[in-house]
């Protein structure tokens, strides 16, 4: 995948072992993701260029609910609000007094937030997945199977069965690290969290 008979036999053996390991990793990740039907947390997000220079640092709060609902609020001074009702996404920029509304892309490779809030039952169709565990932390590395993606690699880390952080790396090596704190799972969430009300006088862009 990515001449003698012995080499061929060795390659086939390795392939079978890798497929078995990957299958176990997929099942474990799916189980960890699906057990949280709702999630709320604070987050801190740090973006670095390929050379490690800091480009941006933000904080905020997220609220997620399966299937496909999320509210991602970034604090001032770079305030933004992204809300999904499961069908469309509204992105509100208060500085510009502008809201952009577009159809929710259900592909996990295009909308990473859906890894935490969407349908992940077929996650292995979109990613090659490997895992490693140490000290109560499980790291899952997801590599998209297609090139039409927002990122080249994504890492999800769980501590004691709860999402702890994630990292995205794009095609030019830019890294986005997101650390979650105060995580609460499976607590009731108001439906209004996922319903965006367009502010009076706002510019509306439909995509």
Curated annotation (Swiss-Prot):
Signal peptide location: 1-21
Keyword DNA-binding: no
One GO cellular component term noted in the UniProt record for this chain: outer membrane-bounded periplasmic space
Main location: periplasm
CDD domains given in the database record: LolA
Record's subcellular location: Periplasm
KW Chaperone (keyword) present: yes
Keywords in alphabetical order: Chaperone, Periplasm, Protein transport, Signal, Transport
InterPro entries documented for this protein: LolA/LolB/LppX, OM_lipoprot_carrier_LolA-like, OM_lipoprot_carrier_LolA_Pbac
GO biological process, one term: lipoprotein transport
Quaternary data: Monomer.
Protein's job: Participates in the translocation of lipoproteins from the inner membrane to the outer membrane. Only forms a complex with a lipoprotein if the residue after the N-terminal Cys is not an aspartate (The Asp acts as a targeting signal to indicate that the lipoprotein should stay in the inner membrane).
UniProt cross-references to HAMAP family, sorted A to Z: LolA (MF_00240)
Entry similarity comment: Belongs to the LolA family.
Name by which UniProt lists this protein: Outer-membrane lipoprotein carrier protein
Species of the source: Pseudomonas savastanoi pv. phaseolicola (strain 1448A / Race 6) (Pseudomonas syringae pv. phaseolicola (strain 1448A / Race 6))
């Amino acid at each position: 995948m990515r001449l003698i008979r012995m080499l061929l036999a060795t390659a086939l053996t390795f392939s079978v072992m890798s497929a078995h390991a990957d299958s176990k990793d997929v099942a474990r990740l799916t189980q960890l993701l699906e057990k949280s039907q709702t999630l709320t947390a604070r987050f801190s997000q740090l973006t670095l260029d390929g050379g490690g220079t800091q480009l941006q640092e933000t904080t905020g709060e997220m609220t997620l609910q399966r299937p496909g609902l999320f509210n991602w609020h970034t604090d001032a001074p770079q305030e933004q609000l992204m809300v999904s009702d499961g069908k469309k996404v509204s992105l509100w920029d208060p500085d510009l007094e502008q809201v952009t509304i577009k159809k929710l892309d259900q592909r996990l490779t295009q909308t990473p937030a859906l890894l935490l809030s969407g349908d992940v039952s077929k996650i292995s169709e979109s990613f090659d997945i490997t895992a490693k565990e140490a000290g109560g932390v499980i790291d899952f590395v997801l590599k998209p199977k297609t090139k039409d993606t927002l990122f080249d690699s994504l890492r999800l880390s769980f501590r004691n069965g709860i999402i702890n952080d994630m990292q995205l790396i794009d095609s030019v090596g830019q890294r986005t690290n997101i650390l979650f704190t105060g995580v609460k799972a499976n607590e009731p969430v108001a439906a209004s969290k996922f319903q965006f009300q367009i502010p009076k006088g706002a510019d509306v862009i439909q995509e």
